[in-house]
Amino acid sequence: MRRITPFFPFFVLLVSHFSLAISYPLPPEGSRLVGQPVTIAVPQNNTQPLESFAARYGQGLSNMLEANPGVDVFLPQSGSTLVVPQQLILPDTVREGIVVNVAEMRLYYYPAGTNTVEVLPIGIGQAGRETPRNWVTAVERKQDGPVWVPTANTRREYAKEGKTLPAMVPAGPDNPMGLYAIYIGRLYAIHGTNANFGIGLRVSQGCIRLRNDDIKYLFDHVPVGTRVQIIDRPVKFSVEPDGSRWLEVHEPLSRNRAEFESDKKVPLPVTPVLRTFIKGDDVDTSRVNEVLERRSGMPVNISAGRPGL
């Protein structure tokens, strides 16, 4: 049974009361499962939208929606419970620098010389202006008070909606890039926002958007030259040291406009390695099917004869 608690039972808030960076101790060798699931109670006479709970508990809106199907995004029901997906499987890649998994809309930062990983929710490029995927680059430079220069294509798109964009938006509180930017490669940035929504959504022009406390933390701690890897893995899985098998499935990103506008689920990418993993004799097949269909964004123990979440 999940414990109902209004507190953070296992992680540290890094910047302020509403800071979103969650610090997890790295698991022992051979393990990729970190954290614990938490359930919180929505206060009586609640007046806050789901975004407020997502921000308070270091999640993106998509993470909360996956974990709580059917929840009212504008006003979660007073007295109800919300699952906060604070348990996760670390991406199966090098634990170095920054790793962004666009499918789960999370950024992982492995600070050098520590035994921790900081996990932050992100917003990514909207359909047709995708954030790059399967890309390894580095932090080229950092800018306190970035200037936004919309591309000609961006200005045309805004014009179609009857909006006029200037050739340049100066630094300041009205800048869509927020107050800090970390430039990766030549064309993209990890930056803040001037809005109070959009984290966990596909809303940017292709860059990676963070809440303002989070980008301030990264800006202060991530050195120029840091390795940055962007992956697209809606399915993560792990065999833990005790032999248990865990599967975490997110809703994949749509691959085109038709998929984006369709009511049908986007097909999951099933690699040969994943197929072997879920077909093993020590796996509960019915539970696997449930996890693949449900796509809760949370790790589930799919081992035969073992309890799930």
Swiss-Prot record:
A GO molecular function held by the record: peptidoglycan L,D-transpeptidase activity
Lineage: superkingdom: Bacteria
InterPro entries: LD-transpeptidase, LD_TPept_cat_dom, Ldt_C, Transpep_catalytic_dom
Transmembrane parts of this sequence: none
Major localization listed first in the record, in broad terms: periplasm
CDD domains, sorted: YkuD_like
One Gene Ontology term from the biological process aspect of the record: peptidoglycan-protein cross-linking
Gene3D superfamilies recorded: L,D-transpeptidase catalytic domain-like
PROSITE patterns on file: LD_TPASE (PS52029)
Record's protein name: Probable L,D-transpeptidase ErfK/SrfK
Organism: Salmonella typhimurium (strain LT2 / SGSC1412 / ATCC 700720)
